[in-house]
């Protein structure tokens, strides 16, 4: 995991101690050092920051898959001359709505534990406050849960 936030790094180390963590400025070298074939097989770009799109494909090995889940404020540029020879596959998009029922069923059945990720809970009547906290990354928020009742 390449992460900038010290709070999120602490969270990852506490809840997922077997996961390797690095910071953005060391990410490319970190991936090369920890892979056997010149980069990552799969890269998930979830940050959506100014330099994270480039960092994502730079960390990918030739013939890798780069999945972009992030939303960007500005259009991203594909620097094709720099990418030449990598033969990357790009996949884009957010959560697939048709999988939501299955994901919720797995969470309800205890097959997926979201407990460590949900740092804040709000009733539906306070959804504007929930969005404000999440959007502005206040109070160490990771994910927000909204209760309908």
Give residue ranges: language-model regions.
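Adenosine-nucleotide cofactor-binding segment
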Residues: 1-53
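Short, well-ordered coil/turn elements that cap or connect secondary structure elements
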Residues: 15-16, 61, 85, 109, ...
């Amino acid at each position: 995991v390449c992460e900038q936030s010290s709070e999120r790094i602490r969270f990852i180390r506490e809840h997922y101690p077997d996961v390797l963590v690095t910071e953005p400025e060391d990410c490319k070298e970190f991936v090369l050092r920890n892979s056997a074939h010149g980069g990552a097989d799969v890269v998930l770009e979830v940050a959506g920051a100014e330099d994270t799109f480039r960092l994502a494909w730079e960390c990918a090995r030739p013939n890798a898959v780069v999945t972009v889940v992030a939303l960007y404020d500005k259009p991203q540029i594909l620097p094709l001359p720099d990418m030449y020879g990598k033969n990357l596959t790009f996949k884009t998009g957010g959560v697939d709505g048709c999988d939501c029922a299955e994901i919720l069923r797995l969470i309800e059945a205890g097959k997926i534990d979201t407990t460590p990720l949900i740092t804040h809970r709000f009733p539906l009547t306070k959804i504007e406050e929930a969005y404000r906290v999440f959007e502005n990354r206040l109070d160490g928020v990771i994910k927000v849960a909204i209760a309908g009742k």
